[in-house]
C-alpha cells in the first residue's frame, strides 16, 4: 500500500536538483511541446535543449567516431580515450532517452567524465532508436558493439579482457540485456554500470506513485509511451530480454546500480539489486537522496551529479567495495 505524502511535488529534491529541473523547464519553454510536433522535430528539440549539458568537462587525448557493420546496418561508435597509457580497460556505454530520444552527442559529457575519472576508454553506441527500429534491434546492436570492441581492442589501446557494459535509463536496460545475451554465449563483460535504469514494464510500484509528474523529470505516461514505441502495439509476449528484471541473472559480472531516490524508476533498481544478490552477483547499490532521473547530466552545476560520477568511477576502478 502506498501512503499519501505530505510533501508537495519537488519539495524532496536537493537544491541543485531543483535548479536542474528549473533549467530544463526553462529550456523546453522556448520550443513547442514535444507531443505537438512530429517525432523527428521532437528529437531535434530534445537534442538542442540537452546540448549545453554536454559541453565542458575533461579533455580526451583522443576522440574518434567510427562506423562498424552489424546485422542491422552500419552502427556509429564514439571512442573516448582519456590518456596515452597503453591497454586501458574500457566501458561500452548506451545512452538513455526511452529508446526513442537522445544520442551519443547528448551524453558526451557524461561519457568523458566516466573516461577521465575511471581511467577507461569509453565507447558510446549510437544505436537505432524506436519506433523506426523496434525491439530487439538496439539490444542486438549493443551485443555487436561489445564484440567489436573486444575484437578490435588492441588497435584502440584497450584491454580485451576488461571491457565493461553500462548505460543510463533505457540504455541501462540495453546494457543488462546485452550482458545476458553475452553470458549465454559464454562471453563476459568485466563489469556492469547501470545508471537509473528501467528493467520492467510494471508501473504499479511505490516509486511510480510517489514521483510521477513533471517535478521529477520522468512520469508514468511518458514511460508507457516509450514502452509502446519500443515493443510495438499490441505488445508481443513477455520477453525477459526486454524486461530483464524477469530474466535469470546468475552468472553476470559485478554490477553497480546508481539510483536517484526521486525517480519513478527507483524501485526497478532496488528490485534488480535484490534479485542480483539472490543470484550471487556482487552488487554495489549507490543511492542518491534528493536526486532525480538523469541527474548525472547536471554535472556542470550539481553536487549530486559530482557524487554520483565520483562513486561509480571509483567502483569501476576497483577502489570502492561492492
PLM segments and residue spans:
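A glycine/proline-hinged amphipathic helix-loop "lid/cap" segment
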Residues: 1-79, 321-322
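Short beta-strand element of the alpha/beta-hydrolase
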Residues: 87-97
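Short amphipathic alpha-helix adjacent to the substrate-entry channel of hydrolases
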Residues: 105-124
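Alpha/beta-hydrolase active-site loop
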Residues: 133-154
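Gly/Ser-rich "nucleophile elbow"/oxyanion-hole loop immediately N-terminal to the catalytic nucleophile
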Residues: 150-165
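Hydrolase active-site cap/lid region
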Residues: 180-235
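Serine-hydrolase catalytic core
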Residues: 234-289
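Catalytic active-site module of serine/aspartate enzymes centered on a nucleophile-bearing elbow/loop
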Residues: 300-322
Amino acid at each position: 500500500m502506498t501512503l499519501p505524502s505530505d510533501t508537495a511535488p519537488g519539495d524532496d529534491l536537493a537544491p541543485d536538483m531543483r535548479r536542474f529541473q528549473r533549467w530544463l523547464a526553462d529550456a523546453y519553454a522556448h520550443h513547442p511541446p514535444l507531443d505537438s510536433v512530429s517525432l523527428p522535430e521532437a528529437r531535434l528539440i530534445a537534442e538542442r535543449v540537452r546540448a549545453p549539458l554536454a559541453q565542458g568537462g575533461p579533455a580526451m587525448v583522443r576522440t574518434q567516431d567510427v562506423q562498424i557493420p552489424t546485422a542491422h546496418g552500419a552502427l556509429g561508435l564514439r571512442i573516448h580515450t582519456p590518456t596515452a597509457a597503453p591497454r586501458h580497460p574500457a566501458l561500452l556505454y548506451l545512452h538513455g532517452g526511452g529508446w526513442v530520444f537522445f544520442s551519443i552527442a547528448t551524453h558526451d559529457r557524461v561519457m568523458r567524465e566516466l573516461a577521465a575519472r575511471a581511467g577507461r576508454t569509453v565507447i558510446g553506441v549510437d544505436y537505432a532508436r524506436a519506433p523506426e527500429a523496434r525491439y530487439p534491434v538496439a539490444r542486438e546492436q549493443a551485443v555487436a558493439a561489445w564484440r567489436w570492441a573486444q575484437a578490435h581492442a588492441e588497435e584502440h589501446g584497450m584491454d580485451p579482457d576488461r571491457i565493461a557494459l553500462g548505460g543510463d535509463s533505457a540504455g541501462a536496460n540495453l546494457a543488462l540485456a546485452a550482458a545476458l545475451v553475452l553470458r549465454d554465449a559464454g562471453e563476459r563483460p568485466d563489469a556492469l554500470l547501470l545508471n537509473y535504469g528501467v528493467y520492467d514494464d510494471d508501473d504499479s510500484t511505490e516509486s511510480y506513485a510517489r514521483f510521477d509528474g513533471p517535478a521529477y523529470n520522468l512520469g508514468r505516461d511518458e514511460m508507457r509511451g516509450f514502452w509502446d514505441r519500443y515493443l510495438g502495439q499490441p505488445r508481443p509476449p513477455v520477453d525477459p530480454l526486454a524486461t530483464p528484471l524477469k530474466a535469470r541473472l546468475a552468472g553476470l559480472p559485478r554490477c553497480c546500480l546508481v539510483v536517484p531516490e526521486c525517480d519513478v524508476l527507483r524501485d526497478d533498481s532496488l528490485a534488480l539489486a535484490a534479485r542480483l544478490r539472490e543470484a550471487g552477483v556482487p552488487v554495489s547499490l549507490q543511492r542518491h537522496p534528493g536526486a532525480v532521473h538523469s541527474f548525472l547530466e547536471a554535472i556542470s552545476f550539481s553536487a549530486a551529479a559530482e557524487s554520483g560520477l565520483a562513486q561509480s568511477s571509483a567502483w569501476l576502478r576497483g577502489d570502492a567495495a561492492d
